[in-house]
């Protein structure tokens, strides 16, 4: 979403790399120093489930980010392997790795804010999943349209963000991961809204419309409307029928409307759903 990505080769190591050219809103003013500070912090982050930012190059008022190169993302993988959703153990392995990457970032006080299957990259050799674009939202903002003028998807956006909260935090990423979890199992997006209001309605139709009892403070959020239809919550088991009881319990905890009640990434990793997982 932030600019063009080139596949390139590091002539010193002969490795393939992804070169992301950042498109800045104020082209003439060069790169804001705050953005450079933010991005420099990301170079310190090293985790097997995060795409490694190898270098930051600042040339002629442009910023180039050098990442390790991975050509497969979770969306492409789900589109090309419809049988993936049947492999619930693989879904669990992927979810565990996604949560490990998110928990690591959150422990360093870095949010993603725009997690979606397209920025979860897969290393085909090891079946490792890695989060791309972590921390870029804070440095550059979330664009409304991508570089190719596609509208940035709202399908994974947390309800507090959609309702205009200015004080959101790490729970926004856990919501996104919950949506991705359901999509891996169902082979289709959970809340495919085509506008902010449609997105909220799609969420409320399944999770239920929030009120002050369910989510204290919700009615004071800038974009909350007392005219929202009052939908009752549905049973998640009817929405994600192929997921067992422990998986549904975890999904339910990740999709709590009230961000203060949503499970953390770290706590999610301790959930019973993962008890049969052995990761190095």
UniProtKB/Swiss-Prot annotation:
Looking at the keywords, is Phosphoprotein present?
A: yes
One term of GO molecular function: cyclin-dependent protein serine/threonine kinase activity
From the UniProt record, list the reaction(s) this protein catalyses.
L-seryl-[protein] + ATP = O-phospho-L-seryl-[protein] + ADP + H(+); L-threonyl-[protein] + ATP = O-phospho-L-threonyl-[protein] + ADP + H(+); [DNA-directed RNA polymerase] + ATP = phospho-[DNA-directed RNA polymerase] + ADP + H(+)
Which residues are reported to carry the modification Phosphothreonine? 148
Active site residues of this protein = 114 (proton acceptor)
Which GO cellular component terms are attached?
A: cyclin-dependent protein kinase holoenzyme complex; cytoplasm; nucleus
This enzyme's EC code(s): 2.7.11.22, 2.7.11.23
Activity regulation details = Phosphorylation at Tyr-2 inactivates the enzyme, while phosphorylation at Thr-148 activates it.
Kindly state which keywords UniProt assigns to this record, in alphabetical order: ATP-binding, Cell cycle, Cell division, Kinase, Mitosis, Nucleotide-binding, Phosphoprotein, Serine/threonine-protein kinase, Transferase
* Enzyme category, top tier: transferase
Q: Which residues form the Protein kinase domain?
A: 1-274
Could you tell me the superkingdom of the organism this chain comes from?
Eukaryota
Q: Which InterPro entries match?
A: CDK, Kinase-like_dom_sf, Prot_kinase_dom, Ser/Thr_kinase_AS
Q: Which residues bind ATP?
A: 1-5, 20
CDD domains named in the record: STKc_CDK1_CdkB_like
Where on the chain is Phosphotyrosine found, per UniProt? 2
Q: Where are the transmembrane segments?
A: none
PANTHER family assigned: CELL DIVISION PROTEIN KINASE, CYCLIN-DEPENDENT KINASE A-1
Q: Which family does it belong to?
A: Belongs to the protein kinase superfamily. CMGC Ser/Thr protein kinase family. CDC2/CDKX subfamily.
Its biological purpose is as follows: Plays a key role in the control of the eukaryotic cell cycle.
Its name, as the record gives it, is Cell division control protein 2 homolog B
